């Protein structure tokens, strides 16, 4: 049922034509994996002041997939930051995170936010 709803959503709201809906959904799935990978890398690195870098990197990687990836990155980022605002945790930090999210989605280099000393693995 959920894939069917997503497909209908793409047709009606996003204006994805019948030739591109499969590609859009594929990009969205890949973008979701990119966002998850950035999150797990952030947790694994556990590096001070690195969250903006991982936000930007996840959004950048997802957006590089195409319109579906950029859409998935925006939905995930907005949901995450919206949850922070609802719970009242760090409104200023949430704004900074959104700036990093938009920076990455726009195709700008996420290394702008890279903290000194972060291992090259990330």
Swiss-Prot record:
Q: Would you tell me the Gene Ontology cellular component terms?
A: high-density lipoprotein particle
Alphabetized, the UniProt keywords read: Acute phase, Amyloid, HDL, Heparin-binding, Secreted, Signal
Region feature (Disordered): 100-122
Classification via Gene3D superfamilies: Serum amyloid A protein
SMART domains referenced in this protein's UniProt entry, alphabetically: SAA
| GO BP term (any one) | acute-phase response
- Keyword presence, S-adenosyl-L-methionine: no
Intracellular or extracellular location(s): Secreted
Which tissues does the record link to its expression?
Detected in liver, spleen and kidney.
Keyword Ribosomal protein assigned to the entry: answer is no
Region Important for amyloid formation: which residues?
19-45
Induction, as annotated:
Up-regulated by inflammatory stimuli.
> In Gene Ontology terms, what is one molecular function of this protein?
heparin binding
Q: Which Pfam families does its entry note?
A: SAA (PF00277)
Using the record, list the residue span of the signal peptide; answer none if the entry has no such feature.
1-18
- Write down the InterPro entries for this protein, in alphabetical order: Serum_amyloid_A (IPR000096), Synovial_Prolif_Regulator (IPR052464)
**Related illness:** Reactive, secondary amyloidosis is characterized by the extracellular accumulation in various tissues of the SAA protein. These deposits are highly insoluble and resistant to proteolysis; they disrupt tissue structure and compromise function.
PANTHER family hit by this protein: SERUM AMYLOID A, SERUM AMYLOID A PROTEIN
Q: What does this protein do?
A: Major acute phase protein.
Which family does the record claim for this protein? Belongs to the SAA family.
According to UniProt, the name of this protein is Serum amyloid A-1 protein
Q: Which gene encodes it?
A: SAA1
């Amino acid at each position: 049922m959920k894939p069917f709803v997503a497909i209908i959503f793409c047709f009606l709201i996003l204006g994805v034509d019948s030739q591109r809906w499969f590609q859009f959904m594929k990009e969205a799935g890949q973008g979701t994996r990119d966002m998850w990978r950035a999150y797990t890398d952030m947790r694994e690195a556990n590096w001070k002041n690195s969250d903006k870098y991982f936000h930007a990197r996840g959004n950048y990687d997802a957006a590089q997939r195409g319109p579906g990836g950029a859409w998935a990155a925006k939905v995930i980022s907005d949901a995450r930051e919206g949850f922070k605002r609802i719970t009242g945790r760090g409104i200023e930090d949430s704004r900074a995170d959104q700036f990093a999210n938009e920076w990455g989605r726009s195709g700008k280099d996420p290394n702008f936010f890279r903290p000194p000393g972060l291992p090259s693995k990330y």
